Amino acid sequence: PKTACPTSGPFKPVRIIGKGHNPEMFRAKDRRYVVYVIDGRYVSDDLNGKWEYGKFDFNARDRRIIEGLSNLSFAQREDSSYVMVCRGGGIWVSRDGLSEYNQLTDRRVYPDVDGRFEDPVIWRDHIQYHLIVNDWLGRIAFYLRSKDGVNWVVDPGEAYMPGVAVHADGQAEDWFKYERLKVYQDKYGRAIQANFAVIDTLKNEDKPFDHHSSKNISIPLNPGLLLTILDEKPITSGTKTIRVKIQAEEGFNPQTDIDVNSLRFGASEEVNYGRGCQVLTTENAGKDLIVTFNGKGNG
């Protein structure tokens, strides 16, 4: 589906609720607004109301806390509880987003590489959980996905790296480093906009009154497609055909906007490398498109 940055501004400050670093906002189970900052949180019933400062409680449950409890990121789970990832890559859960967070993992969930990880961001859509973490020294980020928010799969390749900010007319923005990623989600939970803190040099070379600068930039994201598997039986290696409905959306007509012959279906480990199931037939269903794939090679 086509998308543009829906919240790209311009913005202006309207009030200061307090001090803090590396904030992230979410809504707790009781629908109150929560602004996390390192070593604390602000809570309010109303964005324009009174904000109360406090601290989260943490229970490591005899597990090692990796790199301290900072740069936290939060997502609501299917049962309305909350999952949190800390800078070190530990996974924590809370009953309602404000009550005690308990650590579930005893090791980091990040890729098994020698990275200097920070600024994780976690979110959930209608299918699964997503996590992106930045290697600040290597200036590269990694993408992970999970069905339960605890056990994660690292997808190959880079989530982002310098050079990703390119306009539709081909003009590129030459930022040295991208950090502090946050995502804006649609009603399905899909990430449709990425917000970055960017800078055009090393941080310690950005001096007062010089020509260097840090900015917040927004980049629209492809949200992916709304897919429904129509078959009632689970997919196995012996499945002969797979029927998938591609749902129409505002600004997207699957019957005209898709190169059907380019479609592949299957496990990410297959499709990401150009393999997977190939299209056999298609049929229109109202505004939607139903695609029948050969089941061979689904992974």
Q: Could you say what each language-model-derived stretch is?
A:
Residues 271-299:
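Structured beta-strand segments within beta-sheet-rich domains
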Residues 138, 255-260:
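Short coil-to-beta strand junction motifs in C2/discoidin
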Residues 224-245:
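Boundary/junction segments of secreted and surface-exposed precursor proteins
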Residues 99-101, 253-256:
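Propeptides and adjacent flexible N-terminal/non-core segments of secreted
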Residues 1-228:
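Carbohydrate-active catalytic/glycan-binding domains of CAZyme proteins
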Residues 74, 230-235, 276-283:
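Short amphipathic beta-strand and strand-loop transition segments with alternating hydrophobic
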Residues 246-254:
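Short amphipathic, basic-aromatic surface patches that mediate peripheral association
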